[in-house]
Regions:
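Conserved beta-strand core positions
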Residues: 22, 39-41, 69
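Short hydrophobic/aromatic patches at helix-to-coil boundaries
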Residues: 87-93
Length: 93
């Protein structure tokens, strides 16, 4: 699945969870994906959300994409990885 195809499937889910900003990073963006690669997604919600909301988003994305998904928030990025991730991210929302 290419980036545009991912975006088309992901956006309706992100809108339901009131995500105001989102990006894909990792192997999909770097062109290193394999058949069993997960999809790494960064999100920022419109308002305060709970850990259950984040888990619900992850589960729904995995069901939608039929693939393992890692969901991180922009605020949760580790300082040592933040610059690299932000440089390679492909904004989808």
């Amino acid at each position: 699945m290419e980036l545009q195809g991912l975006k088309d499937k992901i956006l309706p889910v992100l809108e339901r969870y009131e995500v105001k900003r989102a990006a894909i990073f990792g192997s999909f963006v770097r062109g290193e994906k394999k058949r069993n690669s997960d999809i790494d997604i960064l999100v920022e919600f419109k308002g305060a959300k709970s850990l259950l909301d984040l888990a619900g988003l992850k589960i729904e994305l995995e069901e939608t994409l039929d693939r393992k998904v890692d969901v991180l928030t922009y605020k949760s990025l580790h300082p040592l990885l933040k610059d690299r991730i932000l440089k390679e991210q492909k904004v989808i929302l």
